[in-house]
Regions:
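Catalytic domains of cell-wall/extracellular-matrix polysaccharide-remodeling enzymes
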Residues: 1-73, 102-108, 272-280
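Short boundary motifs at domain starts and secondary-structure transition points
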Residues: 18, 84-85, 139
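C-terminal domain-boundary segment and adjacent tail
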Residues: 49-56, 94-189
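A short, acidic, amphipathic alpha-helical segment used as a generic capping/interface helix at domain edges
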Residues: 75-86
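C-terminal beta-sandwich/jelly-roll accessory domains of carbohydrate-active enzymes
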Residues: 145-300
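Cytoplasmic C-terminal tails of single-pass
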Residues: 299-312
Length: 312
């Protein structure tokens, strides 16, 4: 279990885990199951999501497990049908990617990547999805309006705005406005990355992403029969994640995706240590000592061959 601590210390010494926070929340478990000791150790070290061969469980507000969903990004393996089928089954996409296997570079499927980027997906990461899964709560209600209040991120999550789905049966939503000192912008269908805002989906429902303590008033016309407030996904899109496994060179592996809309959860591994530095000087000394002997041997061998040739 010390490997959990060592992995975290290695990562935090190299880079911030996310734009949302410096501490990592995601940990790759390379087996189909994990006993309670491993999961407890992950929690104790501040990790909040593990995957991606463990069966999914997103019902625990303190720790999630996410299984693979949607296959791979590798050329000849990537499949739009697999992605759609697994989203239908699991409610999200969580694709596998490994840029290099031993000494072989793996090619990504550019056609599938282009297709993915054209879909109504929320491009997110394990930690971001977990951290944003805190819907707003009801603060006040009148005959034709309701005030929602942003809640805090899940225990141990990054400080990110939470996603809420709101609907009102039998009425038509006419206005969504932030009534404290903040500003809440309207989202469009072109927004695929988590940020504060709202989008009216139809006359009776709206999706919102609001930070802790923000006050948002929703107003409608008509007599509301029923009001629903529940956890949503950003912009009402399907969560889409890609996971880079066995990442030994983050810069090199992420470079091909710098212009992509897709967001990766990179499971970083330390680069293999070089052999102790004294070996190189010893090799140099060995080469220096051996070279003159080899040269003398070669000269003697050539002279012998020349003499033998002259005798013939």
């Amino acid at each position: 279990l010390n490997v959990i601590t060592e992995c975290k210390e290695y990562l935090t010494s190299q880079i911030n885990a996310s734009k949302w926070g410096s501490e990592p929340l995601s940990f790759g478990v390379p087996t189909a199951s994990a006993d309670s000791d491993i999961l407890d150790s992950l929690r104790a070290q501040g990790f909040r999501v593990a995957g991606d061969q463990i069966p999914s469980n997103t019902n625990d507000s303190t720790f999630w497990t996410l299984e693979r969903s949607g296959g791979s990004l590798e050329k000849t393996i990537a499949s739009t049908d697999t992605i759609e089928q697994d989203i239908e089954m699991n409610g999200y996409a969580n694709l596998y990617w490994e840029a290099q296997v031993y000494d072989t570079n793996v090619r990504r499927d550019k056609d599938v990547l282009t297709w993915i980027e054209s879909q109504d997906y929320w491009f997110t990461t394990w930690g971001e999805w977990f951290s944003s899964s805190h819907p707003a709560s009801e603060s006040n209600r009148a005959d034709q309006s309701i005030t929602l209040k942003g809640t805090a991120a899940n225990n141990g999550g990054w400080d990110v705005p939470g996603n809420t789905y709101f609907s009102v049966e039998g009425a038509q939503i006419i206005d969504v406005i932030r009534i404290d000192e903040g500003i809440l912008n309207e989202l469009t269908a072109d927004d695929h990355h988590l940020k504060e805002g709202y989008r009216i989906l139809n006359e009776s429902s709206v999706t919102l992403t609001i930070p802790q303590d923000a006050l948002v008033q929703i107003t409608w016309e008509g007599e509301a029969v029923d009001v629903l407030i529940e956890e949503g996904s950003f912009n009402n899109f399907t969560p889409f994640m890609a996971v880079g496994h066995h990442t030994t060179d983050l810069f090199e592996w992420s470079s091909p995706f710098q212009e992509s809309s897709i967001r990766f959860t990179w499971l970083i591994e330390p680069q293999p240590e070089l052999q102790p530095s004294w070996i190189l000087p010893m090799l140099a000394v060995l080469i220096i000592l051996v070279a003159p002997v080899a040269i003398q041997y070669t000269l003697k061998h050539d002279k012998g061959m020349q003499a033998h040739s002259e005798e013939e």
